[in-house]
Amino acid sequence: HGTYTPGTATYSQMDYMLKVAGFGNFHVGTIEGYPTFETMLAQLKAAKAKSVTLVPFMFVAGDHAKNDIAGEWREMLEKEGYTVHVRMEGLGQIPEIQKIFVDHIRFGLKHRTQGIMEKKAVYAAGEKNE
């Protein structure tokens, strides 16, 4: 999906990390923010790609995935001459991602949240005991 907030930087970082890891045929584009559709399209052209598989990088492949990715993006890429395939599966359908979420929930249930003021008090108390 993307965002117009500074958090958009994570998407270009993901694109960079994929390429550094050897996945040069993966390109990240966002509906809102950066990298834009045009940025991704330029990468596809530079790579001389003939076909594209669009995969939503969202937990649930809902309306945005259907309307924007499987709809508008698919149409725009087809107009550019690409053969386009769409994999309408959200990240939440992937067992490994489900496991990460369950592990985080279990961790949260076992450990209580500690506020910054409480942490500072612990640090201050530790310094006094030295």
Label every PLM stretch briefly.
Residues 1-130:
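Extended amphipathic ligand-handling, pore-lining, and cofactor/metal-binding catalytic surfaces
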